[in-house]
């Protein structure tokens, strides 16, 4: 039961909480707030847990440390270059690559594999759609595969990035068609995918209209000029003035 309750918390860059947990009749007059991330919820982030679980040293040689394994079909960028691109230390990059290589010997993660990973962490629901959206957010060049470089750059932003960088990453996740705007349709698709991932056995039971209500609250807060879309400027300005979001972003720092 405790795990089910904890699974309700947002993760993987999601800034949205769950309005479905409080009956509508009791929410009147209550100021809407996004829940803060907990360290426990963050450490259950599928990507982090998946990689770190395989990152323990297993007698690897120096070639592992230098990210130059001839058996890997996709060779990642050099260690120095990745260290310059991210906010990870050399030792952290070596550990992350060891875990990535153990799980993905080819050096690539395709979308089907990514969905399988998420399905294992959310067996009570359907994580397929949310995994699709998250995969596209990590697949920076849109080539249908997540390279180690894609993984560590995204992870660096989520764990060590500035608030501005994290918010831009979150906006990119919500902007499904990457046209620079978040529409109600896009946000509803994201919210439905999150609720589907939670499953039907959560407690308290989620109401059917919770995703739509969440979207309406999101746009009331974010759509400053009420033109039906949320721009990156509106998103950044509103979020950076929200103490709840600012506090939640700090929990991404120094986790690894």
From Swiss-Prot:
It comes from the Eukaryota. SMART domains: EFh. Palmitoylated. Palmitoylation enhances association with the plasma membrane. Proteolytically cleaved by caspase-3. It is a lipid-anchor. The modification Phosphoserine is found at residues 14, 60, 63. Residues 67-123, 126-161, 162-197, 210-245 form the EF-hand domain. Keywords: Apoptosis, Calcium, Cell membrane, Cytoplasm, Endoplasmic reticulum, Golgi apparatus, Ion channel, Ion transport, Isopeptide bond, Lipoprotein, Membrane, Metal-binding, Nucleus, Palmitate, Phosphoprotein, Potassium, Potassium channel, Potassium transport, Repeat, Repressor, Transcription, Transcription regulation, Transport, Ubl conjugation, Voltage-gated channel. Binds to DNA as a homomultimer. Dimerization is induced by binding to calcium. Interacts with the C-terminus of PSEN1 and PSEN2 and with PSEN2 CTF subunit. Associates with KCN1. Component of heteromultimeric potassium channels. Identified in potassium channel complexes containing KCND1, KCND2, KCND3, KCNIP1, KCNIP2, KCNIP3, KCNIP4, DPP6 and DPP10. Interacts with KCND2 and KCND3. Calcium-dependent transcriptional repressor that binds to the DRE element of genes including PDYN and FOS. Affinity for DNA is reduced upon binding to calcium and enhanced by binding to magnesium. Seems to be involved in nociception. This is Calsenilin. It comes from Rattus norvegicus. The gene is Kcnip3.
């Amino acid at each position: 039961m405790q795990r089910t309750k904890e699974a309700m918390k947002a993760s993987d860059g999601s800034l949205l909480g769950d309005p479905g947990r409080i009956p509508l009749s009791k929410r009147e007059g209550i100021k809407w707030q996004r829940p803060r991330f907990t360290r426990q919820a963050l450490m259950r982030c599928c990507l982090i847990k998946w990689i770190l679980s395989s990152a323990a040293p297993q007698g690897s040689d120096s070639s592992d440390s230098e990210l130059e394994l001839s058996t890997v079909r996709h060779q990642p960028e050099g260690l120095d270059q990745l260290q310059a691109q991210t906010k990870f230390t050399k030792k952290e990059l070596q550990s992350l690559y060891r875990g990535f290589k153990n799980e993905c010997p080819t050096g690539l993660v395709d979308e089907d594999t990514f969905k399988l990973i998420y399905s294992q962490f959310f067996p009570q629901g359907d994580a397929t759609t949310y995994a699709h959206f998250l995969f596209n957010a990590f697949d920076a060049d849109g080539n249908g595969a997540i390279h180690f470089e894609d993984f560590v750059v995204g992870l660096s932003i989520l764990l060590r990035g500035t608030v501005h960088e994290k918010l831009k990453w979150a906006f990119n996740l919500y902007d499904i068609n990457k046209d620079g705007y978040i529409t109600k349709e896009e946000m509803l698709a994201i919210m439905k995918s999150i609720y589907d991932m939670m499953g039907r056995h959560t407690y308290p039971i989620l109401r059917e209209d919770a995703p739509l209500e969440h979207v309406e609250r999101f746009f009331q807060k974010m759509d400053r000029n009420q033109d039906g879309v949320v721009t990156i400027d509106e998103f950044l300005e509103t979020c950076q003035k929200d103490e709840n979001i600012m506090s939640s972003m700090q929990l991404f720092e120094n986790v690894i």
